[in-house]
Amino acid sequence: MRNGNLAGLLAEQASEAGWYDRPAFYAADVVTHGQIHDGAARLGEVLRNRGLSSGDRVLLCLPDSPDLVQLLLACLARGVMAFLANPELHRDDHALAARNTEPALVVTSDALRDRFQPSRVAEAAELMSEAARVAPGGYEPMGGDALAYATYTSGTTGPPKAAIHRHADPLTFVDAMCRKALRLTPEDTGLCSARMYFAYGLGNSVWFPLATGGSAVINSAPVTPEAAAILSARFGPSVLYGVPNFFARVIDSCSPDSFRSLRCVVSAGEALELGLAERLMEFFGGIPILDGIGSTEVGQTFVSNRVDEWRLGTLGRVLPPYEIRVVAPDGTTAGPGVEGDLWVRGPAIAKGYWNRPDSPVANEGWLDTRDRVCIDSDGWVTYRCRADDTEVIGGVNVDPREVERLIIEDEAVAEAAVVAVRESTGASTLQAFLVATSGATIDGSVMRDLHRGLLNRLSAFKVPHRFAVVDRLPRTPNGKLVRGALRKQSPTKPIWELSLTEPGSGVRAQRDDLSASNMTIAGGNDGGATLRERLVALRQERQRLVVDAVCAEAAKMLGEPDPWSVDQDLAFSELGFDSQMTVTLCKRLAAVTGLRLPETVGWDYGSISGLAQYLEAELAGGHGRLKSAGPVNSGATGLWAIEEQLNKVEELVAVIADGEKQRVADRLRALLGTIAGSEAGLGKLIQAASTPDEIFQLIDSELGK
């Protein structure tokens, strides 16, 4: 039976295909396929000499380099399981990885060796030196199902987990992605922004070139957009692999001239928004822009666009031999165009997570990716969001990526992330974090245009209430957005903020001890202003203050720096307020005034001036109001005129002596009898109301109908 050892299979294939003298890696030096396999066989012998054997574990904590590739293959050659760790992590994370894997050997750099147990650590340089003095070793006989290596998940749903892969796994996703999607040949050279210790980078930079006879450009330092431009101009790669965040920065900071050698661009890690994909098409001169989806558990991409068949705005179609299904909330398979959870099944899915009881696969070998997608009748997959990205606002699910797609259409915005944040009241509201495009400024004017644009294109509950400009968004080392971190932080540079107060109880507005009966009126009728004159002056000042307050809150929501630039007589809808904004304005005014306001009061009174008149009456202690600010009848006998007179009566009643209030109450009873006519029910209410406060409540409940 043929040996299933992956290192041996790759070396055998390179020899038989005549690739030994072809470049495999472009780094500080050009390293051929033959040099890689010869060096790996020698390093395997070094591991054997150090006492390592089949079943042992090695932790590789190194930057990208041809040495790392040879060390990985050496582990596989000897049947040793390799764990690829990120060397840029904190020392505590490295200590955790070492405790979790209990490696027989840690291979790292001089700068990091003090982070690990001295008796188990070796520098890569010393192993390479030893390898130069030994003969190449053989390949441990292994079955295809034998454990080979582990890469760590990105950590978007908790602490990273080491997903275990077998010797046969890379051959599966090499066949799916390299041959079926990208059509890679020995003439292709790849350049990848993701590092080798991630599944995406490991496939693109190691398994793909080794399995196809092609090559990869390797950089020991992170591949920034600027570094990618320099490396591309120097080595002329044909395929550029990256994540959307990386590509957005390439457009922002690089010249297309550096990338003229490319025949296609491959994106993964997060869905590539249609707007960004179109910009990439223009930037790279119309070459295929291929989005796809994979996972650490699968090992590489399993749904992708292909160089000979691709659609912007989609993830492409499933790559054989994988199977996918979209699962509805009830567990059934969703129909075409129906959103659900993406499940995948295939031969390369991880066997499990190291040192953890949970398994990545569910029933009958299916893996729930926790990505929400829909599939059309032709099999094209469109990404929606992460299952754990969905935000809930007021009991309604919101896909934040729908909002983000619209925000980044603005040229001033390079990146956007929308999350739900918890207000001090306990209510949830959406908040947008924005990263400005290089050289651009996101100021109040840009923000106002963004906000109004979102209101025109989205339901109001999907529009963020708070915005902040930040220098960068929190991401995992391989570029995935960490929404959980954003949910925990407050904006560092707030652009504007709608602070929601406790929702009203639904009862009619009530005053909080602000009526004239609780004020001390100085002076009497001897020479000074009369009581009536003082009350009129008091009301005029109160009206001015209330109008100022309403204008100020409305201006904040509209992004207007000058409150008085807002037209007080225009309808709220003409000012740009929708129903949600109007409700929010009333909640803000409730917090400012201390009143409890019905949520519909803004629409009831229609404009800033109408709402201000209503609020002024409430603050004066008035309860007798109507449901419309406009007159119901024409002339002075209209209900609006009656309400105005009742307001004046209430102001006077508030300051008369207690002994006079009973006489006023009697008059009001008689008035109510006249209004009600022969209605027996109202007559009973009048008889039961024995105090002025009860009379006023009766006016509120009966005349306000």
From Swiss-Prot:
Entry keyword annotation includes GTP-binding: no
Keywords: Fatty acid metabolism, Ligase, Lipid metabolism, Phosphopantetheine, Phosphoprotein
Pathway: Lipid metabolism; fatty acid biosynthesis
Gene3D superfamilies: 3.30.300.30, ACP-like (1.10.1200.10), N-terminal domain of ligase-like (3.40.50.12780)
Top-level taxon of origin: Bacteria
Catalytic reaction annotation: holo-[4-hydroxyphenylalkanoate synthase] + 4-hydroxybenzoate + ATP = 4-hydroxyphenyl-[4-hydroxyphenylalkanoate synthase] + AMP + diphosphate; 4-hydroxybenzoate + ATP + H(+) = 4-hydroxybenzoyl-5'-AMP + diphosphate
Cystines in this chain: none
InterPro entries recorded: ACP-like_sf (IPR036736), AMP-bd_C (IPR025110), AMP-bd_C_sf (IPR045851), AMP-dep_synth/lig_dom (IPR000873), ANL_N_sf (IPR042099), PKS_PP-bd (IPR020806), PP-bd_ACP (IPR009081)
Chain ranges passing through the membrane: none
The keyword Lipid metabolism appears for this protein: yes
Entry protein name: p-hydroxybenzoic acid--AMP ligase FadD22
Organism listed in the record: Mycobacterium tuberculosis (strain ATCC 25618 / H37Rv)
